[in-house]
Amino acid sequence: MDLATFLVQCLNAVQYGLLLFLVASGLTLIFGIMGVINLAHGSFYMLGAYLAFALSPIFGDQFALRLVAGVVLAAAFGYVLEWAFFSFLYQRDHLQQVLLTYALILVFEELRSLAVGNDVHGVPVPPWLSGSFRLGGLMEYPWYRVFASVACLVVAFALYAVVNRTRLGMMIRAGASNRDMVRGLGVDIRRLYRIVFAGGVALAALAGMIAAPLSSVYPGMGSSVLIVCFVVVVIGGIGSITGALVASLLVGFVDTFGKVFFAEWSGVGVYLLMAVVLVWRPEGLMKRAV
Amino acid sequence: MRPTFTTLATALVATAFAAPAFAQSGPIKVGLMLPYSGTYASLGNAIENGFKLYVQEQGGKLGGREVQYFKVDDESEPSKATDNVNKLIKRDGVDVLVGTVHSGVALAMAKAARENNVLMVIPNAGADAITGALCSAGVVRSSFSNWQPGYAMGIVAGQKGVKRAMTVTWNYAAGTESVKGFAEGLEKGGGKVIKDLNLPFPGVEFQALLTEIAAQKPDAVYSFFAGGGAVKFVKDYAAAGLNKTIPLYGPGFLTDGTLEAQGASAQGMLTTLHYADDLNTPRNNAFRKAYAIAYKAQPDVYSVQGYDAAQILAAGLKAVDGDLSAGKRDALTTAMHKTVVDSPRGKFALSAAGNPIQDMYLREVKGNNNEFRSIAVKALADPARGCKL
Amino acid sequence: MRSDGIVTAPLNDTRAEVGELPDIGRREAGGWAVPTAAVLVLALLPLVLSPYAQDVVVRIAIYAVFALSLELLVGATGLVSLGHAAFLGIGAYAAVMGSGESGASLFFLVPIALAIAAAYALCVGLLSLRTRGVYFIMVTLAFAQMAYFVFHDTKVGGGSDGIFLYVKPVMQIAGTTVLDLANRAHFYYAVLVVLAATYAFIALLLGSRFGHALAGIRVNEQRMRAAGFSTTPYKLAAFVIAGALAGLAGLLLAVKDGGVNPELLSWHTSGEVLLMIILGGIGSLRGAVIGAIAFTLLKEACQSEALLGPLASHWQLTLGLVIIGFVAALPRGLIGLVERVRQVGAPRG
Amino acid sequence: MADASPTASTAATGTPLLSARGLGRRFGGLAAVDDVSIDLAVGQIHAVIGTNGAGKSTLVNMLSGELAPSAGSVHFAGHDVTRWPQPRRARAGLGRSYQRTTLFPEFSLAENCRLAAQAGAPRPWRFWERASADRAGLATALRVLAEAGLAADAERVAGTLSHGGKRQLEIAMCLATAPQALLLDEPLAGMGAEETGRMLALLTTLKATHAILLVEHDMDAVFKVADRVTVMVNGQVIASDVPERIRTDRAVQIAYLGDEAPTLAAGAAALLPEGAGPALGRPGGRPR
C-alpha cells in the first residue's frame, strides 16, 4: 500500500486503540486494586452506549451535557452495584467471581432486551461534529472520529494525572501493588474500592457513549469488546494504566493491519500478539516487579 | 443420600421427556423452532406471526386437520441445534418442522429432519447447501438462498457498467455465499470482483476496510451485513464519503429493518431482495392489511416468508387430505414441490431442490422505506449445486 | 491462586488403622459403592426410557465427562480455566475431520481426538501456566477464543456453518463390527462406558502420588516448592490430561450431534461447564456429574413455557438470577448441601 | 564490624555447609538486604535476630531460593546454588519452615509429612498406585513425626492441631525431605512456654546432624540454644559473634534499646512482643 493509505491506516489503528483503552483501563484498575475478575465489564460499555441512545432525545444537541449526565449516571450505577453486589465478591475466590459476573452478563443482556428490545438503534452525531474533512486523495475522515480520539486522549491524560498526581491516585497505585500496605496506611479501603469501581464503570460507559454514534447500539455489543479488553489487560499488565494504553494501541495496530493483509486470519492476530508477550514477559509489559 | 439424588435426577429426566405416542388422527403437530431470545428474536416473532396468519385464514386447519403448535427457542445457537430440534422431533413428536433464521442451526435441523423423516419448511435461513449439496425431498424453503439476492445484484451492477468491484462481509457462510453470488452475476455482465474484504463476525471495526476500499477505488462495493453490522457499515461508509464516489450495493438485509438507525446515510442505496414492502399488488396489499389488523404491526419480508411457509405446507397437506402416513409421503412432498405459491411477493414455484424460483426486486432506499424500483431478475432459480434431486 | 479454602474436601474420619492412612485422594465418602450403583442404574435405564429421554441421558453423560475433565483442573489442582471449551471443540473437530466423507474406525478417531486436544492443551498450558490467578483465567479464555476464530473464520473447519459427520464411526475387530455408534443402543452404552472409565481414571489419578501432589499444589503451592516439588510440570500434566479428556467428550458430542460447529468453542460453553462443576460442588468428582445433570435440568426448567410462561423467552434472566442466588447461598454446591444434610442427620465425631 | 567474620565459626566447626557471600536484595529503591554474608555448619545453630523489617525473612527467602538475590552468591554443599530454583535446592537438602504456618490443613499429619517426603522420589507417572500404599514415604513420615514428638497424632487432620502442634508439624515436614540444612523462620512464634521448651529440645538434638539457621524474636530462647548470633538492622549485619559477646555488644544494645541499656536479653524480649513478624517479604503469602 502507498504511504498515504498507510498513514490513514495508522490513524484508524490509533483511534480504535484509544477507544479500547477507555474500556480496558477501568477493567485493569478493578483487577489491579480489588483483585476481582469482572466478566460483566463489557456490559458497562453496552450500558454507556444505550445511555447515549436513551439520553440523546432528552438533551438533543447538548452533546457535552449528554456525556456528563451519562457519566454521572453510570458512576452512580457503579457505586450502587459495588455496594449491592461486588463488595460481596472480594472475599470469594476467583472461580465464584467468574461465575457471578458471568451470570450478571446474562441478567444485563436480558434486562436490556426487556427495556429497549433487540432492534438496532442509531445515535445522532452532534451537528457541530457531523462534518468530515478530506484526507489526501483517498477519503473523507469524519470530524467525530477525530473528536473521539481526542476525547479518549484527554481522558487518558486525566486518568494518568489522577493516578500519579493525587492522593487518591497514590492510594490506587499502592493498592494495585500491595493491598495489605494500603490497609496498613489506615485508608478506608471499602470507600476506595467503591470509588475505583464507580470510576471503572464510568470509564467503560464513557467509551460506550463516545462509540455509540459511530457503532450504533445493538444487542451483545458488550461481550465482543470484553474479550479484547482481557487481551489488552494481559498484555499491558494488571493494574497498570500506562500498560493498558500501550497494549490498546498495539492491539489496535495488529487488528487494523491484520484485516488488510490477512483477512481470513485477522481474528487470530491479537491472540498471537498476546501469546508472544506471554512468552516474553508473563507479567505483562508494564507490571512493576513486586 | 447421594445415590437417591442421582437416581431421582435420572428418573426426573425420564418422566419429564417421555415421548407421546404418534397419532394419525387429531391435530397436525407443527414444531416452530425459531429464535425467541437474543439478536434475532424479532425475526422469529415475525415469522411465527406470518405462519399463524395464514393458518387462521384457513380457519385454523391445514389439510382438514387442526394445527397444534410446539415452540422451541433455538437461541441461534448451532452447537445446541441438535438437542433443540430433538425436543420437537423426539419429545413432542411433531409432524412438521418450521425453522429457522440462523443458517448453521437450519443445517443441523435439516439433517435431523432427513434422518427422522420429518417434513421441514425453512422460513428464512439462506444457506445454499440446504437446497444444494444437502437437499432432500422432505425439506423445502419459502425464503431464498444466499446466492439469489447476491446474483441479482451482480446482474444489476453489470448492467450499470461496473467493471471493477470489491466485496465486504463477515467471515461467515451467509456472507461468503452472498458475495460469491454477486461475483457470478457481475461476471455475466463483464465485470469482475478485484478483492474480497472480510472481518471476524460480529466485528464492527470497519475503518481499515474502508480505507482499503478508498485506496483501491473500485467502481462499486457489494457488502453483506445484518443487524448492528449492517447499520454501522452503511453509516461508516457514508461518513467516509465513499458513497459519493463509489456506490454501495447489497442484498435487502443491508437495509431491511435497519433504516431508522441508518438514517440519512442509507438514502438512495440500491438493494435486491425477493420482496419490497410497497409492492403495489392486490395480493400484497391484502396481506399487509390482514397482518396489520391481526398484530397491530407492519409486516416485513420475514412475515412474508413465514406466511408462505404455511402456504407450501398447506398445499402438500391438501393433496393428501392431511394424511401423513408413510404411504402418502411421496404424494405429499411432490405436491409441496409442485405447488405455485400465491405469495405477497408475487407468485412463485419451487425448484426441484425445494428453493423458490422467484423474481428479484431492485429496491431503492427513500426515507425509511425500501421502495420498489424494478424487477432485477425475473424468476431467478438457485443453481442448487450438488443437489441430486 | 486464591483457590485455598473453597476446595476443602470433607475430612475423613480416623477409623483407619495405622499404615492405612486417611487418603485425601478418596475424597468421597462411601468410596466406589455409589458410582457403581449409579452406573448400574444408568445401564438399566434404556429399558424404561423413551428414545428422547435416552438422548437426554446421553447428552448429560457427555457433559459429565466434560465436567469431570474440568474438575481435574479446577477442583483438584486449583487452576480455574475459562477456556476449556476449546479442547472440547478441538476434539470434536478432530473426530469429524478425521472420519471425512467415508467414516473411520474408533481405533483411529479416539487416539486422534485425544492427541490433538492434548497437543493444543500442551501449547496453551506452557504459556498460560507462566501466569497465575486472574491472569490465568483471562489467558485461557483468550486462547480458547483464538481457537474459536480459527474454526469460525478460516476454511480449516468449514467456517461458521461447521461440518457434518456423514458416517458415524464404528469399531471393528477382525472384520466384524463390534461397535457401531450409528446404533442408538451401542452409542448409549459407549458413552456410559466412557463416563465410567473417565470417572474411575480421575479417581485413581487423585488417589495416586500424582493426585496428592496436585492436591498439595492446590492447597499451598509455595509449601510444595519448599518441599522440593517442581510444581509447573505437575500443573502442566494436569492441564494436558484435562484437555485430552475434554477432547474425548468432544468426540462423543460430535458423534451425537452428527456434526460440529464453531459455537462449540465459544466462551459461553466454557462458562457453562464451570457452572456445572460449581453447581454440583467443587472438589468432588460426583459433584461434577451431579452438576452436569443439575445444570441441564435447570436450563430446561428456565426455558419451559409450562413452568414460567412468558418469562421462558427471557430464560437467560431467570438462569442468571438462579446462578447468582445459588453461588451466593451454596458456594460448595449440591454436594455441599448433601454433606450438610448428612452432618445434621448423623453428626460425626 | 559490619562484616560478619565467618572464619570464627568455621574454625569452630569444620567447613561451612551453606555459605552466602555479599547477598543483597532491593525492592524498588529500598534495600531490604544489603551485603550480608553468613555461614551455616553442621553441629551449629546460627541465630539471626533483628528488629522488624531488618530483612531477616528476606535473607531466608534468598537462601532457600524463593527470592533471587540482586547481588551476592549462595554456595551449598560445594555447589554454587545461586541460580538454582527453590525446588532444586530443596531436593539438594536445603529445607525450610515458614514463619506463617503453611500446612495442608485437610490432610492427616502423616499425609502432610509423606507428601513432603514424596518430593524426594515423586514417581508421579505411576497413577495406578494409591499414595497410601507408599510404604517408604509413610515410614519416613512416621519417623519424623516421632522425632517431632507428634507420633501419637499421626492420624489426626492437621487443621485440628493446636498452634504449637502446627509449628512442630512444620519442622517435621522439613525433616521429611531429609535436609542437611534447616532454615527455620520463627519456629517459636506464638508458642507457650512448655511448647517452646519442647521445640528447643528438638532443635538441640537436630543440630548434631543438621546445619540450622534460626530466625527468632524470643531472645531468651535464642541465647539459650544459639552457638552463634548474627544481628541485622535495616538489612545490614551489625554484629555476628558468639552469644556472650553479642550480649554485651554496644552497637547491638544501641540498635535495640538506644543507650543506657540493662542486659539485652530481658529487655529485648520484653520490648519485642512474641510472634511480632518483620513487615518485609511475607513468605507463604503468595502475590496476586
Residue ranges and their predicted role:
Chain D
Residues 2-288:
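Glycine-rich phosphate-binding loops of nucleotide-dependent enzymes
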